[in-house]
């Protein structure tokens, strides 16, 4: 059983009991979160439900387990023949959510 949800302009495939790192949102650790924008899902019986654009009445419930930052991404700008370069880094914030139930 799985579902594809939309969060932060991205789509994520989630399963029950799985921990997924999503875009940061302001909730404390241990708080419940619901996702109503389920785009597609498969039931335990194997039936696939596709939304237009979302599956009606479907929701994914999870619990926030961690707030943090991803690994650093290094950006390097190099100007050829000028002996000049610029280096910059970025660390994106995330919220880790453990999926507790999927209802389609």
Curated annotation (Swiss-Prot):
Protein name, per record: Large ribosomal subunit protein bL21
Family: Belongs to the bacterial ribosomal protein bL21 family.
Summary of subunit composition and partner proteins: Part of the 50S ribosomal subunit. Contacts protein L20.
UniProt cross-references to NCBIfam families, sorted A to Z: L21
HAMAP family in UniProt: Ribosomal_bL21
Gene Ontology terms for molecular function: rRNA binding; structural constituent of ribosome
Role noted for this protein: This protein binds to 23S rRNA in the presence of protein L20.
Transmembrane segments: none
GO BP annotations listed: translation
Domain of life the protein comes from: Bacteria
SUPFAM superfamilies cross-referenced by the UniProt entry: L21p-like (SSF141091)
InterPro entries in the record: bL21-like, bL21-like_sf, Ribosomal_bL21, Ribosomal_bL21_CS
Organism: Francisella tularensis subsp. holarctica (strain LVS)
GO CC entries: cytoplasm; ribonucleoprotein complex; ribosome
The entry's keywords: Ribonucleoprotein, Ribosomal protein, RNA-binding, rRNA-binding
